[in-house]
Amino acid sequence: MRSWGQGAGKVYEIYRFPETASDTDYMVRFSTATIEVAESDFTLYPDYLRHHRTIKGACEFDVNVSGTHRVIDNSGSVFDFFGDTPVKCKLTTPSAFATNLIHRPQVRVKDRVLKLANLSMNVDELFTLPLVPNSDAQRLLNIVYVIEGELKLDSQQCTLIQGDTLIVNDQKLTLDTPKCTISTNMAQIYHAVIALPQAPWTAHAVPWPRP
């Protein structure tokens, strides 16, 4: 955990790939962040794209690209932008909580928020979120973050509570997904799918077209 934006809030990095990568050469990073001051400037991430989802609260973003336009962000909405784009965040609620996927342009990401109640299912049933068509990815990462409530992993005899995260890598599964059952009485979860390019891959920046 560390502060961001000169005390604008706290950021919690949960996962990066590769796990041994430095702050400038990872392919993708997943984190959560609080937004706690009325107005702040987002941290810049040159050579990356940002996929920002507001989970709780609401903000207004001033985005400076060839002039200024404004994006209103309500709870649950998704906001994608270039990591080197100046973005000013203005709270429209007392505070906000968000998830961030910061990734190289050749990495594809997709996410959603689900409310689960009184269910039991195999983990592989959960991991059905469609990705970008015709993706060249050969490696998928699934991230499940518990926003509220709890999830029980029956075959693992463990329980995930608020703030816990499950990472499943399709090349080296940490769970036997076809046999691993999750169950819950009530939970709200964040689920992301990350499609990584075919190996050999490079973590160095690649050019992308500007709008």
Residue ranges and their predicted role:
Residues 1-211:
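Jelly-roll (double-stranded beta-helix
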